Amino acid sequence: SVRVSRRKTTPLTMELLVVDETLDEIIVVARGRVADPFGPVSNSFLNREELRSAVGAGSDVMRALDGLPGLISTGDFANFSVRGRGPRDNLIFVDGLPFDRVVHFDQTLGEEEDIGGGGRFSIFAPNSIAGADFSPGGWSAAYGGRSGSLLELEVAGGGPTPSASLRVDIAGVEVGYEGPSGIHDNTTAFFTARSFDFGRVFELIEEEDIGQPELTDIVLKTVTELDSSNTIEFLGIYAPEEYSRDIDNVLASPNFEDVALIETEQDLALVGIAWRRLVGTSGEWTNRLYFRDNDKTSVEGEAYPDLVPEGTPAADIPVRENLLTVGEAETEIGWRSDYSMQNRFGELQAGVRAWQTDVDYFVTLREDWDRFVYQTTDPRPPGQQYITLMPDNVDSLYNERETSYAAYGEQTFEFDSWDLRAGLRYDRDGFSSESLVSPR
């Protein structure tokens, strides 16, 4: 016998025996849930078990996507590129809420590969994601604003059977719970919390020059069934991180190849609530409210161990700390409403979005700084093999608050052997004061 539980994946292996009987027809369905059936053939959907057991992923949700059609991943980072676009050009939703910062250590300062790589480590613990729907292009009119790909992640919502986990290793500790909430009879909960200090790992493998990255991830989701037609979902994510690289890490660098002194601190949070309501015989109306916050400060300096004799104590090595400071603060509050129903043509979908974004960015250079790594287009005197950053040319400040909104509608026409989906989307960007109408 097989026990089937709501919102829980149960792997099952079945072997067919050879028999002499003749059967007229056998229908085999590969899976109960697939990617957008009206999207392009390159769309892909990975369930919880496939994400958890993906070869080479190391239980990292983002690395498990490697190998999907149209997706390019170097393997060194937990992010990806599509059609030559950068990792930050991808449109990412978590439980239908816009949340593009789903990886840790997406550096603003430091080595060039770290700045452009898009992050090293997913904020989601193994087994946290119930499904990942990926589309490299041609997605529904419900989505827009980015030119890369669309990735929709669904956080596990718990189940009627309680289960708990504990994992302890040299990097840190991870705990998890999935099951009834214990507060309300019709409420299930999913909770994970972990804290890792990778500095201990790098010290063990004698790679101290990397630095000391630390992270914490806390994810809580509850699903409450009010009645047969109404469901309330709550999602909370808190994922702070810290990264430091001091003079001891510089001294561990082979031949002092990297002399950067870096301090980075980031607070990342998302809170959202969704109300799903069945309307009539085939309609579904979903409303979502969310608040997300990201506050990141990055500071870079430089050490000069090559200016003193070998073996000089770390405290006596000349350094220039806090040369460059970059602040990135962004908060957003938004509302999303979607409605879908079946009609005589097929499926009709429509929705609206409204969100207010508050950004506060600044760059401050304490004093002139000679840099020997630069772009070929950076201005400098003829023959000079370095550039000099000066506060007057570097210091900047951008602080704005704007409201944006969008609306869409689309109709799917279903025929015997083919389908057609046509839609229209309107976007209004408050920062650029630009309006776009996009037929799909």
Where are these regions (language model features)?
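Hydrophobic, lipid-facing positions within transmembrane beta-strands of outer-membrane proteins
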Residues: 147-149, 162, 168-175, 216-220, ...
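A beta-strand signature from Gram-negative outer-membrane beta-barrel systems
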Residues: 112-165, 174
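Structural signature of Gram-negative outer-membrane beta-barrels, strongest in the C-terminal barrel
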Residues: 229, 330-332, 340, 345-349, ...
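Transmembrane beta-strands of outer-membrane beta-barrel pores
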Residues: 136-138, 155, 168-172, 181, ...
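Short, acidic, small-residue-rich periplasmic hinge/interaction motif at the N-terminus
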Residues: 5-62, 87, 95, 99, ...
